[in-house]
């Protein structure tokens, strides 16, 4: 893709936002190394869909994309460019004509790009060749609205804003576009298995409470967002109501006083004082982020070595997946 773009092709034009949708955010891979400043990671809720959106456009893995939650985003292209949309199945049209997700294609200046609403799942990712050109804040373009950091103004994308991007060169028109085979595309469902590594604070939960936690299903409550998912189901009790505030990892499963688990995600606070029964592995956190109220999860306890094996298995599958030239 680097042969398609030139430095001269970078300009303040890109996509004009005519409808911002339910929640659309500028995101790159995330903001790291700023916990000491009280700044969390941000980044894509579904890291796998984010990865493929950038890969289909030939981008670096940290290139800036747009994360669309639930749908409704509408844009007018101001330049010729190559885009791809991945993630939850949202109807995608260009000038009213249906387009396919999980593949890259050319969009010309003046084209209208519209996303409908997801029938299942929550989030999708719109990438453009070369990435959106957004100024980094604290080393990242990732938007965290709670912290007013990242993106264009530290907030969600708004109507009449322009999302700058690169212009495709004349040679780009002749470039073969890419598609991820359907067999390699994620399946979005209404229930997810969450592999969980027990934490050292498991000592505050009796053997019976832990067995009940892993034996029962939980439903996503009405309180779910990029910060975390509050679940509802069989309450789990710890022998303490709180701990001294400490750092919180991605995927941490907090058990507050009411016993209803909270799985913390990208926009979580950097410290917290609830006991944690364990942590969900990152690949399953991405799956969790595609659930909505009423959907179901089941926790399964695994060891650190099993978590490491799953990481390498998922990495191997990612490397084996081959994009198809169209």
Spans of model-derived segments:
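Conserved "landmark" site that anchors the functional core of diverse proteins
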Residues: 1-326
């Amino acid at each position: 893709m680097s042969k398609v773009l030139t430095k001269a092709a970078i300009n303040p034009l890109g996509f004009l936002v005519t409808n911002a949708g339910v929640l659309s955010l500028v995101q790159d891979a995330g903001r790291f190394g700023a916990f000491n400043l009280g700044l969390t990671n941000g980044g894509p809720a579904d890291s796998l869909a984010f990865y493929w959106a950038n890969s289909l456009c030939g981008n670096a893995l940290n290139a800036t994309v747009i994360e669309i939650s639930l749908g409704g985003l509408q844009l007018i292209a101001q330049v010729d460019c190559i885009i791809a949309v991945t993630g939850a199945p949202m109807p995608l049209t260009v000038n009213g004509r249906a387009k396919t997700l999980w593949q890259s294609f050319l969009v010309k200046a003046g084209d209208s790009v519209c996303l409908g609403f997801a029938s299942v799942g929550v989030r999708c990712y719109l990438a453009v060749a070369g990435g959106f050109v957004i100024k980094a804040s604290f080393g990242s373009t990732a938007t965290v609205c709670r912290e007013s950091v990242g993106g264009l103004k530290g907030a969600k994308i708004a109507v009449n804003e322009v999302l700058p991007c690169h212009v495709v060169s004349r040679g780009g028109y002749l470039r073969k576009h890419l598609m991820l085979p359907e067999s390699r595309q994620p399946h979005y469902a209404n229930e997810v298995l969450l592999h969980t590594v027990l934490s050292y604070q498991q000592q505050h939960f009796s053997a019976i409470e832990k067995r009940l936690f892993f034996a029962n299903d939980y439903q996503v409550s009405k309180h779910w967002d990029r910060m975390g998912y509050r679940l509802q189901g069989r309450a789990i009790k710890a022998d303490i109501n709180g701990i001294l505030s400490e750092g919180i990892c991605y995927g941490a499963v907090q058990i507050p006083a009411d016993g209803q688990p909270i799985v913390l995600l990208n926009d979580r606070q950097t410290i917290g004082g609830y006991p944690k029964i364990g942590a969900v592995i990152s690949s399953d956190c991405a799956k969790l982020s595609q659930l909505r109220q009423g959907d179901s999860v089941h926790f399964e306890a695994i060891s650190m070595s099993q978590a490491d094996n799953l990481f390498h298995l998922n990495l191997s599958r990612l490397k084996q997946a081959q994009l198809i030239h169209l």
